[in-house]
Structures are given as C-alpha cells and as structure tokens.
Amino acid sequence: MKYLITGLGNIGSEYWGTRHNIGFRVVNHLVESVGGNFTEERYGAIARIRVKNCDLIVLKPNTFMNLSGNAVRYWLQKENIPVENLLIVVDDLALPFGTLRLKPKGSDAGHNGLKNIAQLLNTQEYSRLRFGIGSDFPRGGQIDYVLGKFPPEELQLMPEILDRATEIIKSFCLAGIQITMNQFNNK
C-alpha cells in the first residue's frame, strides 16, 4: 500500500521552530526515524520511505500554507494514491500543547492550509493528525502565537511527543485509522 503523509508548515528559515510549523517537524522526525531523507521535487521536499509493507511518500509542501492543496493534489495524482491513504499533520489551537488527535475527516477549524486542501480535493474526508499547540495568548494575539516559537518547557517535552506522533503515523499506515484512533486518541 502507498500513502501520502503531508506535514503542513510555512517555508523559510524564519518559520523553523514555530508552532505553525509543527507539521514539518513531525514529518522530519518520521523520516529520520527510518533513516530516510528529503529531496527537493515539484511542490515540495519529498522523502520516500518504507514502513514494513507500506510505501510512504512524505511531503513538506514548498507552497505557502494557504496553498498547500496544490502540492497535496499533485502528489496524490502523480503517485496514484487514494484520498483514504492521505494523512495531513497539522497544528491545532483547540488542543492543549502536546495532545495528538487522529481524525478520519472533519472541518478545517479555521486552518487555511486545511481549507485549501479541502477546496482542491473537493472533500473534507481525508485523515488528519492534529498536534495541539495550546491557545495561551491574549485576545487578538493568535497570529503572533502560532508564528511564535515553543518555550523551553514545551521544547523539553517535544522528543517524547514527536516519538508518539511517529508511532501514530506508522500505525495509521499499518493498522488503519480506526484501530489507530482507538489505540492512541485516548492517551
């Protein structure tokens, strides 16, 4: 089976380490965990890795966040991957920091990257792994918060959370979404 695993983030070194780029960070960790690496290809950085009997195309789009759907649609079509085998890794303000939630479908929850993907795929029925970044910001401070870097106390917890996110992605490919949600969403 072939899967497209896409981490959402903004391009540019000034965004590295920001909350909004946690999708890139998660897929970097996934690829490193199996000794793979990324190469620049059309619409983004691509890694081709294998997890047991699953072929994973791992994508970090090089489009702006709100145009991520262009990259996702291109790679689904190019690799002939069904939407059921798509997983988007995305930051989520509605979840406390470090909470990971796998969902089989859903709304964009105001996330412009997800909004664009749903628009270009003409469906919201694709899986997403939501990484909680919390919402500890004053009224009107959302943009500064998501584009801000993680504080030291959260960075300290990051390796364990990234390991767990990697386990979830591997399980999604090997066992399917329902078993993976049952196993990980309540932890």
Curated annotation (Swiss-Prot):
Enzyme superclass (EC): hydrolase
Quaternary data: Monomer.
GO cellular component, one term: cytoplasm
Active site: H20
EC code: 3.1.1.29
Localisation per UniProt entry: Cytoplasm
Site (Discriminates between blocked and unblocked aminoacyl-tRNA): N10
Catalysed transformations (reactions): an N-acyl-L-alpha-aminoacyl-tRNA + H2O = an N-acyl-L-amino acid + a tRNA + H(+)
GO annotation terms (biological process): protein quality control for misfolded or incompletely synthesized proteins; rescue of stalled ribosome
Role noted for this protein: Hydrolyzes ribosome-free peptidyl-tRNAs (with 1 or more amino acids incorporated), which drop off the ribosome during protein synthesis, or as a result of ribosome stalling. Catalyzes the release of premature peptidyl moieties from peptidyl-tRNA molecules trapped in stalled 50S ribosomal subunits, and thus maintains levels of free tRNAs and 50S ribosomes.
Family: Belongs to the PTH family.
Paired cysteines (S-S): none
Residues that coordinate or bind tRNA: Y15, F64, N66, N112
UniProt keyword Hydrolase, yes or no: yes
Keyword RNA-binding: yes
PANTHER family (alphabetical): PEPTIDYL-TRNA HYDROLASE (PTHR17224:SF1)
Residues carrying the site annotation Stabilizes the basic form of H active site to accept a proton: D91
MF (Gene Ontology): peptidyl-tRNA hydrolase activity; tRNA binding
Keywords: Cytoplasm, Hydrolase, RNA-binding, tRNA-binding
Protein name per Swiss-Prot or TrEMBL: Peptidyl-tRNA hydrolase
